[in-house]
Amino acid sequence: DNVYFARSALNIGKENLFKYYKNLKIGEKIPFELALNRSQYINKNQKVNDQFIADSGYGQGQILMNPLQLASIYSSFVNEGSIYQPHIVQGKTKTWIKNVFSKETSQTIKEDLINVIADEKGTGHSIYHDNVTLAGKTGTAEIKQSQSDTTGTELGWFTVMTTDEKQPILMTTVVEDVKNRGGSGYVVEHTKAPLDLYLSQE
C-alpha cells in the first residue's frame, strides 16, 4: 500500500533512508560480467522535501532500479540479510553485500513475501504452488512528466523466488505499458509459465 510505505519513509527520515540506499549500493557500479545501467534514488541538484521522501518510500520519486540489482536485493531475504552477487554462469555464488539487513528483519520480510503468494488475497497468489514455498512482491511504477500528468504509462514489476535450497530460483520480470492491462497482475500471469516449467524439471 503506497500510503503505508510513504508514511514509513517519512518516519524513517531522509538521513536514514539515504543511508540505506547507500548500504544497498544504489547508484554504484553493479559487479557483473556485462555493463549495466546503474540504479539511482535521486537526481543531481534535487531539492529534498517531505513529498520527495514520501514518493521515494513507495518506489516513485526519482528511483530507477536496475532489475538485476533489485533481484539481488531480494536474495538477502533468503540469505540471512546478505545480498548475493549476480553472475551469468551457474556456479558457486559469492556474497556482494554482507549483512545489509539483520537476520530478524530478513525473516520478517521473507514471511511477508510468502504471504503475497500464499494468501488467497495476495497480489501474487495466481502462481501459488502446493509443493514449493514461493515468496514474491508485485509493483507498479508510474512513468509521467509531472504529478498532474494523467497520460503517462506504467511499468509492471514482479519478483518471485523459492525459499527451498533444493529448488533455487529468483526471477524479476518487468513489462512496459501495463496500464489498463491489469497492472502488475499482468506481469504475474506472464511469469507463471517459465516458473512452472522450471519447477516441473526439478
Over which residues does each language-model region extend?
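Short, gly/Ser/Thr-rich active-site loops of penicillin-recognizing serine hydrolases
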Residues: 94-97, 188-202
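Noncatalytic linker/hinge segments flanking ATPase motor cores
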Residues: 12-13, 178-179, 201
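Beta-lactam-recognizing serine transpeptidase/beta-lactamase-like catalytic domain environment
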Residues: 1-175
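A short acidic/glycine-rich loop-to-helix N-cap element
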Residues: 176-189
